[in-house]
Amino acid sequence: MDSKTPVTLAKVIKVLGRTGSRGGVTQVRVEFLEDTTRTIVRNVKGPVREGDILVLMESEREARRLR
């Protein structure tokens, strides 16, 4: 990651559940720090909990909902 890559900071407001073939991915709802009215659902690999701040390299894509 170089200094020219634009990133977006987002705060985890709710952990929705585990997904992936072995449950190695967590689906979370995040709220953007710059625009707190906007929330999206993302998939996160690794440990995550409510209140964590994520650095999103791409902030437009939203994850599909769990079944």
Curated annotation (Swiss-Prot):
Q: Which UniProt key words apply to this protein? A: Ribonucleoprotein, Ribosomal protein
Whether Ribosomal protein counts among this entry's keywords is: yes
The name under which this protein is listed is Small ribosomal subunit protein eS28
**What are this entry's molecular-function GO terms?**
structural constituent of ribosome
Question: What SUPFAM superfamilies would the database entry show?
Answer: Nucleic acid-binding proteins (SSF50249)
Query: What organism is this sequence from?
Result: Kluyveromyces marxianus
HAMAP family assigned: Ribosomal_eS28 (MF_00292)
GO CC aspect terms: cytosolic small ribosomal subunit
